[in-house]
């Protein structure tokens, strides 16, 4: 296949999240691959022939066999900690079980968080260029792509994922680096706090497989209270709503205040001993750090992105908290797509389908001549 033919092929877009990997072809509305960013290895000794031939599984395969596996997540707080596992995940994306294509036949768009670790970026580029032999590569910021997916060029994006939350103001397509805020708080902290609450209730869910069960409980049962204190008082007096969850062994867990106290850590991180700011305060700081002439525009163009913002009641609580600290004069408007779990991927899909995307690509030849070129081209 010639270089021209390769560049005529659909680019591939990969969004590397701490919680989930999203991957697919440019121009598509939804990612073809959507699976947990995890790897599982057999933790028991094989004593007889079995239909399970492999010792390692990726993503949903690992989740389906989690009782037999030790589950590990290679990305922690936006930084890749286990490179061999992450490389297995990237290789799996191109396999016949997922995209069923060859990496050397498609240009690639990779998303990255703001304030990305430089060493991380170097190693990612090295793997894709030198091991997978991708012909060309471009990096783009996740919040910028999320704004792109909302059909805007100006606004402020709150990107709340599994391990990190960013608030990034963008004006006319340009991010404002001095106003970017990052906090090490996200969906994983909600899961951890829920796990602690369940332990206090007598439910010991401590193994890596059981941690995934806690994550499922969070997604099915948890919600954000519109007023945390009032919700506590109401539940104490009337016990208005009790949730149940059936474990794989058919035991039933009964959940009360845990359903709304766990997500509360996103707005009050001090509950779990963290010094991070609540998400509403984080975004408020970003707006205050932006130029005074831009603030009213940013207040009226807030875009929620990331899977953790899908918690029931999140948007209502967020806008209520932000209005309380920003003052009545500011017109606060929030835009929250139902598909915001993969907003960044969708923005990347749109960007990579444009004819102008070629100008953003760094070819393998350019990379071979100067590896630092990946730091000089920005979206």
Swiss-Prot record:
Keywords tagged on the record: Cytoplasm, Cytoskeleton, Dynein, Microtubule
One of the GO biological process terms: dynein-driven meiotic oscillatory nuclear movement
Keyword Calcium included in the entry's annotation: no
Database matches in CDD domains: ASKHA_NBD_Arp1
Cytoplasm recorded as keyword: yes
SMART domains: ACTIN
InterPro entries, sorted: Actin, ATPase_NBD
Subcellular location(s) of the protein: Cytoplasm, Cytoskeleton
Pfam families from the UniProt entry: Actin
GO CC, one annotated term: cytosol
Residue stretches in coiled coil: none
Major location category of this protein: cytoplasm
Subunit structure: Self-associates to form an actin-like filament of 8-10 monomers. Component of the dynactin complex.
Function description: Core component of the dynactin complex which assists cytoplasmic dynein by increasing its processivity and by regulation of its cargo binding. The dynactin complex is required for the spindle translocation late in anaphase and is involved in a cell wall synthesis checkpoint. Arp1 forms the backbone filament of the dynactin rod structure and serves as the scaffold for the remaining subunits. Required for proper orientation of the mitotic spindle.
Family, as annotated: Belongs to the actin family. ARP1 subfamily.
Name under which the protein is recorded: Centractin
Organism: Schizosaccharomyces pombe (strain 972 / ATCC 24843)
């Amino acid at each position: 296949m010639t270089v021209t033919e390769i560049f005529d092929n659909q680019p591939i877009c990969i969004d590397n999240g701490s919680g989930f990997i999203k991957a697919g072809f440019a121009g598509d509305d939804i990612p073809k691959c959507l699976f947990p960013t995890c790897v599982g290895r057999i933790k028991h000794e094989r004593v007889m022939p079995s239909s399970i031939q492999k010792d390692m599984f990726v993503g949903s395969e690992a989740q389906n066999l989690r009782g037999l596996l030790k589950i590990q997540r290679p990305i922690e707080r936006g930084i890749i900690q286990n490179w061999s596992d992450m490389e297995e995940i990237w290789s799996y994306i191109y396999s016949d079980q997922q995209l069923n294509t060859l990496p050397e036949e498609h240009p690639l768009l990779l998303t990255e968080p703001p304030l990305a670790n430089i060493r991380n970026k170097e190693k990612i580029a090295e793997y894709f260029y030198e091991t997978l032999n991708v012909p060309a590569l471009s990096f783009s910021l996740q919040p910028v792509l999320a704004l792109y997916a909302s059909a805007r060029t100006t606004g402020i994006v709150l990107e709340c994922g599994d391990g990190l939350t960013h608030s990034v103001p963008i004006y006319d397509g340009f991010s404002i680096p001095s106003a970017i805020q990052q906090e090490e708080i996200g969906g994983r902290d909600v899961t951890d706090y829920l796990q602690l609450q369940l332990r206090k209730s007598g439910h010991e869910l401590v193994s890596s497989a059981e941690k995934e069960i806690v994550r499922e409980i969070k997604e099915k049962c948890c919600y954000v209270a519109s007023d945390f204190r009032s919700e506590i008082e109401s539940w104490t007096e009337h016990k208005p709503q009790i949730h149940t969850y059936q474990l794989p062994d058919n035991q039933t867990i009964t959940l009360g205040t845990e359903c709304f106290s766990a997500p509360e850590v996103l707005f009050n991180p001090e509950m779990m001993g963290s010094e991070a700011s609540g998400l509403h305060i984080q975004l408020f700081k970003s707006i205050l750090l932006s130029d005074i002439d831009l603030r009213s525009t940013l207040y009226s163009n807030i875009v929620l992105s990331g899977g953790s913002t899908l918690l029931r009641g999140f948007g209502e609580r967020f806008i209520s908290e932000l209005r309380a600290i920003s003052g009545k004069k500011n017109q606060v408007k929030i835009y929250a797509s139902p598909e915001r779990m993969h907003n960044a991927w969708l923005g990347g899909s749109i960007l990579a389908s444009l004819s102008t995307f070629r100008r953003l690509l760094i070819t393998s030849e350019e990379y071979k001549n100067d590896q630092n070129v990946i730091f000089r081209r920005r979206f």
